[in-house]
């Protein structure tokens, strides 16, 4: 579809919003639970970090192994595998995140794929050995939202990293991608654009 107007962007946005809706951060009650086909979860997503560090540690092979495991179990139509941008926690990569319960698995290797599919995706049981261990409490933390490393951050420019597929333009548009550009080109004079940038406080 060729995008010529803001209306065109809104059509794409509406079409892609449903996919991203499943990735919305869960509330605290849901975050302590687990999803899985055996528990009645109708559809799941597996987010895999595709950043440089994780890819160097075989995250792309993990994605392939997960896809193969889904196909062997005849559930590939119930689970989407999505390669995202960097989660920002390279020390703990490769990172795999299960949606909708937001379980955050760290230092995953290709040989973990069958267990992730069998135990978590199908069985609805979190894999304790792959969960992040808080260095202060020495307790496992299953949701990145409750990790000190992330809790103290407020991402702005990088807020979509680890959330969308950087190679899927529709996912970017679903989060209002290009809306500001379209507004500037179609509705604002050059002087107004300059004024907005000045008032924004952006530098560099």
Residue ranges, per PLM feature:
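Feature of Fe-S/electron-transfer and energy-metabolism proteins
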Residues: 1-204
